Amino acid sequence: MEIFTTTRGTSAGPEPAPGGHGGTDSPRTSDLSLRALTGCVLCILIVSTLLGNALVCAAVIKFRHLRSKVTNAFVISLAVSDLFVAVLVMPWRAVSEVAGVWLFGAFCDTWVAFDIMCSTASILHLCIISMDRYWAISSPFRYERRMTPRFGCVMIGVAWTLSVLISFIPVQLNWHARGRERTDPGDCNASLNRTYAISSSLISFYIPVLIMVGTYTRIFRIGRTQIRRISSLERAAPRATRGPALCDEESSLKTSFRRETKVLKTLSVIMGVFVFCWLPFFVLNCMVPFCRLEPAAAPCVSDTTFSVFVWFGWANSSLNPVIYAFNADFRKAFSTILGCSRYCRTSAVEAVDFSNELASYHHDTTLQKEASSRGNSRGGPYQFAL
């Protein structure tokens, strides 16, 4: 979400002096090399974002069963928002990074609105997915009754509506800027006023990240409790049959520890990637409007630094398909689309591992039967399938 930046000479360094011989050739060559390297890196990022999210959308279009699960609708809508980032936001900025100047004139305001809308929609969908997981794991039976397709569509609609409201309306009415009109067509500067910087950052990042931290913390606690209950039942079984209880108990404790570690690693990856990509940008986004600068003074944050953090945030859109759409159903669809089903085949146990089930929770027949049988064996519902 690039809501404070300028595209004049951001990543490629200062323009070389025109003309000249000898000593001016080396800076010019270095500048061109840096621009070429920047262009290659950004092209790779854009293409990977396009391919990853397009693959998710293609899988949903091709396979009807992926459209039948409400939780997959959130992953699909997330992929669409990230696809919009790759199409409506990244390419225009990449061209400007390489050229060192904004080349698209009056399109600047529309582009800024697209940037805010798409980035906010992506982050809000990550928040919705975390809430969906928490509800599914904490109250699975109530979740099955209440998480209907209609309710899922309402949640998706709220995310997109909120994203549009905080982007296009303020930008088109110029409520977001610091009170000066853009006069240079080669400068797409969207420096924010303090009110809009704080309010938009709260809606787009800080409130969603607090919700995600809360839901994933609760998920870890629920998972740890269920793992320990299962482990205690497994240790009790050999005692009932008078088997080698000591060895089985030690093995069960090791298994329980491995499961808890896997839960923690999975949740750490989900939250760690998101925070690593977006936190630096939003910290600067709230800090920069409070800088008091003289007209001729240097900015308190360099354009290059801000540009790097902006691209880190957008890079999250290339990682989301890997984190959120690699459950067993999607992986099978991907292997079929890519024509590698013979080589990508995995066993049933490997295909439905914990990290994938947690990354995109869904009930299938096998898991429901397993949950029912284990739940009946201890007189209660099995709430956390591994």
From Swiss-Prot:
SMART domains: 7TM_GPCR_Srsx (SM01381). Residues 1-28 are annotated as: Disordered. One of its GO terms (biological process) is positive regulation of MAPK cascade. It is found in: Cell membrane; Cell projection, Cilium membrane. Glycans are attached at N189, N193. The chain crosses the membrane at residues 36-56, 73-92, 110-131, 151-175, 196-220, 267-292, 306-325. Residues 1-35, 93-109, 176-195, 293-305 are extracellular. The keyword Cell membrane applies. One of its GO terms (molecular function) is G protein-coupled receptor activity. Residues 57-72, 132-150, 221-266, 326-386 are cytoplasmic. Disulfide bonds join C108-C188. GO terms for cellular component: ciliary membrane. It is a multi-pass membrane protein. Keywords: Cell membrane, Cell projection, Disulfide bond, G-protein coupled receptor, Glycoprotein, Membrane, Receptor, Transducer, Transmembrane, Transmembrane helix. Pfam families: 7tm_1. Residues 1-10 have a biased composition (Polar residues). This is one of the five types (D1 to D5) of receptors for dopamine. The activity of this receptor is mediated by G proteins which activate adenylyl cyclase. Belongs to the G-protein coupled receptor 1 family. This is D(1)-like dopamine receptor. It comes from Oreochromis mossambicus (Mozambique tilapia).
